[in-house]
Amino acid sequence: MNKCRLLKKKKLNKLRNELDSLDNTLLKIIKKRTAIVKQVLKLKDYKYQIVDKKRIKIILNRIKKKSIKNKIDPKITNHIWKNMIKSYIDYERRNFKKK
């Protein structure tokens, strides 16, 4: 392997390690977010309260604005947030207990 290729491989491994570290941080944040969602779910009396379309729209608009302000592709963040919201809606539906 030539020197240039070796340096690229080393740099690639370093960047992948940084991504792995960020993934670990994201997992901690997701754990914290899930704990809050559990608390929110306990406050909901009816299953229809799980999906709040107005709030979802507000969240997605806020994330879009912040993404643009921070020079992040809003298509990426929109996709991430929509999937996260869908996942938590599914989680709430599976864990909803009638009172």
Residue ranges: model-predicted function:
Residues 1-99:
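Domain-level signature for soluble enzymes in the chorismate/prephenate branch of the shikimate pathway
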